[in-house]
């Protein structure tokens, strides 16, 4: 099968492309810069330079694809100067742009990777898909709005999409806050953040990849 992957040069993307290649699938990776796409090219992926916020760079990008795996996002830890408008541009409008290409190309299966941040503060424990979402951060609000646009296209345009909300993903190649915490723990240090116990759900990147593939295949 042939898969189009957005956000392929991020943290999860290379792990996903590696697994798809090992399973005998062909990958087309959308990246903003070829400079970061070397490892993907080494895995045999087709590299397409483009930007989900620029519709003209996406024209017919999904043609001939059997699946779209949409990972591209502007994360809440990307930069402390990120504004709500920037989250809206990338996470919401960017999602609309790539989903329109999927509809146009009649891609038979689409997976939209979202975040538990879309849920925000939830009174239900454990939470379910039916739990009320009250995101309190601009990032979470943008992820929820992106989900809603995908669902609207499912209902109005027949987009064959599944949505996955990931918690904190960790594993090899992770350069973000989890790496900093692990390094501190190895030194016998573990900072207490906040004034009360804080539980964070974690998922290993290999499990995240398997979740994406299951959603794509079912």
Regions found by a protein language model. Name each.
Residues 93-139, 154-155, 162:
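Conserved Rossmann-fold NAD(P)-dependent oxidoreductase catalytic core, especially the SDR/UDP-sugar
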């Amino acid at each position: 099968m042939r898969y189009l992957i957005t956000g392929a040069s991020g943290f999860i993307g290379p792990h996903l492309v590696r697994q798809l290649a090992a399973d005998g699938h062909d990958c087309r990776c959308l990246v903003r810069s070829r400079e970061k796409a070397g490892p993907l090219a080494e895995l045999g992926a087709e590299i397409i330079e483009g930007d989900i916020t620029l519709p003209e760079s996406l024209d017919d990008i999904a043609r001939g694809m059997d699946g779209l795996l949409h990972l591209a996002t502007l994360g809440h830890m990307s930069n402390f100067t990120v504004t709500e408008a920037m989250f809206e541009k990338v996470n919401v409008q960017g999602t609309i742009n790539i989903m329109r290409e999927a509809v146009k190309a009649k891609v038979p299966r689409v997976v939209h990777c979202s975040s538990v941040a879309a849920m925000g503060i939830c009174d239900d424990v454990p939470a379910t898909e039916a739990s009320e979402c009250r995101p309190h951060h601009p990032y979470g609000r943008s992820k929820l709005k992106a989900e809603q646009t995908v669902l609207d296209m499912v209902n109005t345009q027949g987009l064959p999409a599944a949505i996955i909300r990931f918690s904190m993903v960790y594993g090899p190649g992770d350069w973000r806050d989890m790496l900093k915490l692990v390094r501190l723990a190895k030194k016998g240090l573990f900072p207490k953040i906040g004034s009360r116990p804080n539980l964070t759900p974690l998922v290993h990147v290999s499990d995240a990849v398997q979740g994406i593939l299951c959603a794509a295949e079912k």
